[in-house]
Amino acid sequence: MVYKDIDRTTEDFRRILCCAKHFAKQGKLVVMPPKLDVPYKNSAYDVIYGSLKGTAYYGKCPDLMVDNVWYEHEGYNSENPKTNFSNMCKRGLRQSDRIIVEDCGLTDGYLKRNILIRQNEGQQIKELWVKKGNILRLIYKAE
């Protein structure tokens, strides 16, 4: 389900829609909610994002919900792959502990090691997916 208030003209919309289609093809229920400018002042926030209440992400607007679990997609704009990945994780983890990042050319081994280092530093990461073109790959899932 895509909310009618979403700006469908952005490149970000197309990337997130690609992610949504990936999960929907697996038979999962996918919701693409709108971004709300000032969530805590918007009465629709609790209706749409109410499941975030009581979490560190309450007041945030993650990009999509898959089977009642929130995911955040992040892209990049630098030429340095390691900087790109670091920035995507940093921004994504502000919205959700399940993130989808654009492929920046790093190996799966590097990505997994980086996630383990972040977890040892106390960051909560439940899933990491990499999107390359129209394909999503699960790199890490917490047990």
Please report, for each region that a protein language model flagged, where it lies by residue.
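Metal-dependent nuclease catalytic core centered on acidic motifs
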Residues: 1-49, 55-58, 76-143
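A short, glycine/Asx- and small/polar-enriched loop/turn
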Residues: 57-60, 67
